[in-house]
Curated annotation (Swiss-Prot):
Gene name as annotated: OPG154
A Pfam family recorded for this sequence: Vac_Fusion
Protein name according to UniProt: Protein OPG154
Lineage: Viruses, Varidnaviria, Bamfordvirae, Nucleocytoviricota, Pokkesviricetes
Subunit record text: Homohexamers, covalently linked. Interacts with OPG144 and OPG153.
Species of provenance: Monkeypox virus
Main location: virion
InterPro entries: Chordopox_Fusion/A27
Amino acid sequence: MDGTLFPGDDDLAIPATEFFSTKAAKNPETKREAIVKAYGDDNEETLKQRLTNLEKKITNITTKFEQIEKCCKRNDEVLFRLENHAETLRAAMISLAKKIDVQTGRHPYE
């Protein structure tokens, strides 16, 4: 079950290396120095560019999470108001039904 993506998918084990896009992640058994020599991806500008791209992605994700949080908070407020409105309507309908019963003579006035 260590190589599975989802619990219960033991028959469809997917190695985790298929989900990584870096060259180093696809060859985890080799040493980092050998990968750097083979692919030449360890110069300083490339690392800075990769870090900048990663920072942009993280910033984008955090702003999206903030937007989701605001949306969920707004939906929670709207749902709370709707629940209160439904409870008020229920109480008004019960009161109206009692009033109609008294006026039609079904139940005596209490």
